[in-house]
């Protein structure tokens, strides 16, 4: 029994060390885009800030793809149509800035604007009509009743999503329904990047 426990602890320790290394590597890759993000933000009149955009890059691609902010779909309606990181950041910042301005105008919290980056701008109006504060419950309902059906999932089909923040809330997403945990992941990744930047 003791030997089994010792093996389990050794495996857990190895897993934690390995994951820490992977996360640190991904954060460093994302931080390489900081000058590009700073330049883009300086050219835009926006309420977005560098840390928020970097956290969104981490959430979207961890800096591992040319379309670092996954801007293609909102730009052209097709995946992977943007093949240049600068263009991806420029379009992503423009969309985020637009969402933040709309959120302020509608009197909703800024995390609604971040969630709308994943769900689409209409989510801002939805939240304005439902209390003005982005929540997982509202995001879940919107995903199920608006986003998923608009992309063909009219049966409420779900799939398991392996992310710690999702697992806390049941771990399921609606097929074609976007990511109901998106804004929370970005928020979490803000702190993750700050922490990993210290090492």
UniProtKB/Swiss-Prot annotation:
Pfam families the UniProt entry points to: Lysozyme_like (PF13702)
Main location per the UniProt record: other
Subcellular location: Cell surface
Gene3D superfamilies for this protein: 1.10.530.10
Cellular component aspect of the GO annotation: cell surface
InterPro entries: CwlT-like_lysozyme, Lysozyme-like_dom_sf
Superkingdom as given in the UniProt entry: Bacteria
Disulfides per UniProt: none
Protein name: Pneumococcal vaccine antigen A homolog
């Amino acid at each position: 029994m003791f030997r089994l426990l010792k093996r389990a602890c050794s495996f857990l320790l190895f897993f934690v060390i390995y994951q820490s290394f992977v996360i640190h590597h991904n954060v460093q890759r994302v931080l390489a885009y900081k000058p590009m993000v700073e330049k883009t933000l300086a050219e835009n009149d926006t309420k977005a800030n560098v840390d928020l955009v970097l956290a969104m890059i981490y959430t979207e691609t961890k800096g591992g793809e040319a379309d670092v902010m996954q801007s293609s779909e909102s730009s052209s309606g097709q995946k992977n149509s943007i093949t240049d990181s600068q263009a991806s950041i420029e379009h992503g910042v423009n969309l985020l800035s637009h969402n933040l301005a709309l959120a302020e105008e509608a009197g909703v919290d800024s995390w609604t604007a971040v969630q709308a980056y994943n769900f689409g701008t209409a989510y801002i109006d939805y939240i304005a009509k439902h209390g003005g504060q982005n929540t997982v419950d509202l995001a879940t309902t919107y995903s199920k009743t608006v986003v998923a059906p608009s992309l063909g999932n009219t049966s409420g089909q779900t799939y398991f999503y392996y992310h710690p923040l999702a697992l806390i809330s049941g771990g399921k997403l609606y097929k074609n329904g976007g990511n109901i945990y998106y804004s929370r992941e970005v928020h979490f990744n803000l702190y993750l990047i700050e922490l990993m930047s210290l090492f």
